[in-house]
UniProtKB/Swiss-Prot annotation:
GO terms for cellular component: cytoplasm. The lineage of its organism: Bacteria, Bacillati, Actinomycetota, Actinomycetes, Mycobacteriales. Catalyzes the GTP-dependent ribosomal translocation step during translation elongation. During this step, the ribosome changes from the pre-translocational (PRE) to the post-translocational (POST) state as the newly formed A-site-bound peptidyl-tRNA and P-site-bound deacylated tRNA move to the P and E sites, respectively. Catalyzes the coordinated movement of the two tRNA molecules, the mRNA and conformational changes in the ribosome. GO terms for biological process: ribosome disassembly. It comes from Mycolicibacterium vanbaalenii (strain DSM 7251 / JCM 13017 / BCRC 16820 / KCTC 9966 / NRRL B-24157 / PYR-1) (Mycobacterium vanbaalenii). The gene is fusA. Belongs to the TRAFAC class translation factor GTPase superfamily. Classic translation factor GTPase family. EF-G/EF-2 subfamily. Residues 10-286 form the tr-type G domain. GO terms for molecular function: GTP binding; GTPase activity; translation elongation factor activity. InterPro entries: EFG_II, EFG_III, EFG_III/V, EFG_IV, EFG_V, EFG_V-like, EFTu-like_2, G_TR_CS. GTP binds at residues 19-26, 83-87, 137-140. This is Elongation factor G.
Amino acid sequence: MAQDVLTDLTKVRNIGIMAHIDAGKTTTTERILFYTGISYKIGEVHDGAATMDWMEQEQERGITITSAATTCFWNDNQINIIDTPGHVDFTVEVERSLRVLDGAVAVFDGKEGVEPQSEQVWRQADKYDVPRICFVNKMDKLGADFYFSVQTMKDRLGANVVPIQLPIGSEGDFEGVVDLVEMKAKVWRGETKLGEKYDTVEIPADLQEKAEEYRTAMIEAVAETDDELMEKYLGGEELTIEEIKSGLRKLTITSAGYPVLCGSAFKNKGVQPMLDAVIDYLPNPLDVPAAEGHVPGKEDEIISRKPSADEPFSGLAFKVATHPFFGKLTYVRVYSGKVDSGSQVVNSTKGKKERLGKLFQMHSNKENPVESASAGHIYAVIGLKDTTTGDTLCDPNQQIVLESMTFPDPVIEVAIEPKTKSDQEKLGTAIQKLAEEDPTFKVHLDQETGQTVIGGMGELHLDILVDRMRREFKVEANVGKPQVAYRETIRRKVEKVEYTHKKQTGGSGQFAKVLIDLEPFTGEDGATYEFENKVTGGRIPREYIPSVDAGAQDAMQYGVLAGYPLVNVKVTLLDGAFHEVDSSEMAFKVAGSQVLKKAAQSAQPVILEPIMAVEVTTPEDYMGDVIGDLNSRRGQIQAMEERSGARVVKAQVPLSEMFGYVGDLRSKTQGRANYSMVFDSYAEVPANVSKEIIAKATGQ
């Protein structure tokens, strides 16, 4: 059977399960694995036994951090699932899994509806145009409301959602779903504890009218996908079940609409029909457009690869993980062609040869060896030395560089000091391995203190990285207080700033003269720097131009106000001079570095700080205290709304003011409020705060 699936890609689905942190995503994935026959015992997140959560920290914290890739089978179809984390600190995991998926199941909490993180993940899925079906989970929970959840999808996501099921009963009485396509009820009765059996019965009389109303809306949405169906519908003819399913499939694959289902993964209700919907409505690798990329070194020469075994091999490495026995495991989505284990391929992103060691299809962290990798599938590879997240692997004779991913810079940093000399060595290894796995984990040496500083996307992110250093790499280290990752930028353009680097110490000297303009700049795709060369007539030899650029970029690592990285600037090299004997790449690099510092000082430099989008959910009684507290933290209230009987306050608050917020919020609201925050943008710091930051950084 597995062999058929390799050749018949219509029977393959590469999907992700995406959601807010507590919507029940891992539990849903566990149930899928159970019903498809791979897991023999259902793993519960509550007792830390979930199959997909395979790192110790994940099992302890009950959250998913790394997206494990798992293969399972359902009705002769193969489903490759990537479980993505829902916590905001791990957006990188979500971002990279969405890049390699063909479709996704968005899981929502039946009581909360669309939450801040679900909104963020939904937007990321929009960015990569991933078709989705929605699963409203936790229908057994007190306060669960399917219709409210569907309304929040319309209001907050602006999504054209099409319910194809309705719940039967709710909260403790939730017992099944109305299938609007077949107009039957599917009911899970109490006898089968694990919910593997359900009965298909007539729709309960009290739901008949509502089912008719929602079915009409569904059929109208389906009819709009196809002129023939529209004619049939307007002519008063009934659409067949096959026509409805093919219309829903078209609606989903073109992202024109999103079918909505419901259930309770924890209570084992509604999971099998959701698996049927994955097969019926989500795309197979042949339904999605051919993978596009460019010829190495020629970014404007676009080429594509179809998902066929006859095409040249190409694949994208989307995750690197450290395995206890095999060392480095690289997860690869194969987009075209076929390649055997042991083959030589090229990492076209880096221009390096690689040999594929063993190939596996993974079940969470158990591995199933295979002989070859073919288009449309996801594999784990051992033996790749230089390949990191976002790199393309391809046929050495027909190379392509596939579109990669963009990762945000860290917003929070901590200094880390090894306790002993042997810890120092272990720390080096740990940092290298963790940085390979996680592109949002950044490291640098503080030039003033000589300390190693690590940066990440939030406090939880750094906690887990430090925890992994201790557990996996046995590094004992002291960790400093979290620090905000400030940036510096400039406000105005300065023109014709000149610098001459001259050194004469016997023998050959050093000489380089440069003239630049420096101006504020924000590029597409979040680029924060641009260098333009306008030198004419050989005033600076061509081979020295890149050195000026490199020198300017070096100087940007440490800004002129408080030593924070300088961003959002454009350097235009206008003119200069050189000396036949004394000029060198090094001399022009120094000149490039010094001229940038000189220009930045007169370009009205300012400090930027990370601003977080904060959402606090609180009972009405504490509303005044919560708003007062956010205002005292330099917060700007953006909106207030009601949700499930509580009040929700949305605000933008500087990250520097949010340390320790969780404790303050608990004490102000007697533990009844909760909050979430995601990075929003960088903004200029007020003058009084700027003075404090500069004084602290320069020790004045």
